[in-house]
């Protein structure tokens, strides 16, 4: 794949490995206002005065409308094609604690005192737990069935070893370059 950039370092064209191109246009604030895919479909995006995306219209039809709370946090995305809405609820610290998708499925997220995700619970009640080292790196992740994966880091914070849920390990070695 390849990317072409404008003089401001923004991607203006992406070409995939299958030679499918996507073009991007920006407003004076750096917001993507137009996206054209390899099939010629065009998505126009609009923004409010705070540069928050408020809508996406594809091929002239408004499809997505974004709403924000007083703190500027995205609280809903409405799809006019399906007439369904995704919503997000936040705690007092501005952390997303509950997400409801278009089908009504609720995902809940718990955080530790450092703001790190420690538990994610899906709509079926399945929880994934995360543990961190003192540097904020995820060192263990445990799924609802009790299967764990672990990541070990070296003194430089680089991944030294990963052990997946089946117990298979991959070790990493770094050179001086």
Residue ranges and their predicted role:
Residues 1-16, 20-122, 126-143, 147-177:
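Beta-strand elements of repeat-based all-beta scaffolds
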């Amino acid at each position: 794949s390849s990317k072409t950039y404008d003089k401001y370092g923004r991607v203006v064209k992406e070409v995939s490995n299958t030679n499918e191109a996507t073009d991007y246009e920006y407003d004076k604030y750096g917001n993507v206002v137009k996206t054209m895919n390899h099939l010629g479909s065009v998505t126009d995006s609009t923004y409010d005065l705070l540069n928050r995306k408020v809508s996406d219209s594809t091929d002239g039809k408004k499809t997505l409308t974004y709403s924000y709370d007083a703190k500027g946090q995205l609280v809903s995305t409405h799809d006019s094609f399906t007439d369904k809405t995704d919503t997000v609820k936040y705690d007092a610290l501005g952390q997303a604690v509950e997400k409801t998708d278009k089908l009504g499925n609720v995902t809940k997220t718990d955080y530790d005192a450092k703001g790190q995700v420690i538990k994610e619970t899906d709509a079926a009640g399945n929880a994934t737990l995360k543990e961190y080292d003192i540097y904020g790196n995820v060192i263990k992740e445990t799924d609802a069935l009790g299967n764990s994966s672990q990541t070990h880091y070296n003194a430089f914070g680089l991944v030294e070893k990963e052990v997946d849920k089946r117990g298979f390990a991959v070790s990493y070695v770094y050179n001086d370059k």
